[in-house]
């Protein structure tokens, strides 16, 4: 009986240890993935802005808006509970994200839909609509950054 209790205790400790390691890895992975993703959509946004400022053919950067939209759809999953600045993690994500997760997720969805509008305008080479959609997309980025991202 005593041996069974010891074995059960050791097994429970092993399960907790493995689960803890998996959680730490998944939190670190989430942080790394979202940082890489935000860097990529920042670059995509810059390319769209450059094309808008140049005033030429916009169709060449329509795929960049699609990248922004696709990433917007992934954002909610990249902010699982416990993936903030805990345990020395290097992230600018503020607790407000998880305190108001439904609002945060909704803002990501809005950003994605704004980027869809941007993609359509770019594909149509409609400079006026593209400029308006670009403002909508980047404005929505700011709607999340202000309450949810710590300054550098």
Q: What name fits each language-model region?
A:
Residues 1-10:
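Bacterial N-terminal signal peptides that target proteins for export
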Residues 9-17:
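Bacterial N-terminal signal peptides
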Residues 18, 135-138:
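Processing junctions and N-termini across compartments
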Residues 18-24:
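Sec/Tat signal peptide C-region and signal peptidase I cleavage site
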Residues 27-136:
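Extracytoplasmic c-type cytochrome modules immediately beyond a signal peptide or single-pass transmembrane anchor
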Residues 137-149:
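The canonical Cys-X-X-Cys-His
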Residues 152:
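Short Cys/His-rich "knuckle" micro-motifs
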């Amino acid at each position: 009986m005593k041996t069974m209790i010891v074995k059960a205790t050791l097994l429970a400790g092993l399960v907790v240890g493995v689960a803890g390691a998996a959680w730490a890895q998944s939190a670190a992975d989430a942080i790394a993935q979202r940082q890489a993703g935000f860097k990529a959509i920042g670059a995509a946004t810059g390319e769209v802005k450059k094309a808008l400022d140049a005033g030429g053919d916009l169709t060449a950067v329509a795929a960049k808006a699609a990248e922004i939209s696709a990433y917007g759809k992934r954002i909610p999953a990249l902010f699982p509970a416990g993936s903030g600045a805990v345990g020395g993690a290097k992230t600018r994500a503020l607790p407000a994200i998880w305190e108001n997760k439904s609002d945060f997720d909704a803002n990501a969805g809005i950003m994605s839909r704004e980027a869809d509008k941007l993609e359509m305008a770019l594909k149509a080479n409609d400079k006026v609509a593209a400029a308006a959609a670009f403002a909508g997309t980047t404005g929505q980025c700011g709607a999340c950054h202000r309450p949810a991202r710590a300054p550098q």
